[in-house]
């Protein structure tokens, strides 16, 4: 069974995403992944770059094109681009058959297995999250 991963990004995060995906595969050598790539501006060249720099035998990329109009009125800051909002609407963006997905920032490095995190008991909640503290 493939683990479902969600990433949200713009073209400025393609290279960091290749690092994240390679570290994910390296730290989870016994797993295959379906990676949902939610974006509104990636090009074919961006996806081609990913396919050339990430082993595709264990990593299926799924292109989730988000309409530009979906977040046209959302507040955008330098540290809060519109792509940040996509994860909040994962249930609307992902295929209905996806019943569990793990969101990972495209600029992190995975250093351990994510099995335990992926199988976390939500205790009846629709989602679980970790806090992010600055400073």
Where are each of the predicted segments found?
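Glycosyltransferase catalytic domains, chiefly GT-A lineage
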Residues: 1-135
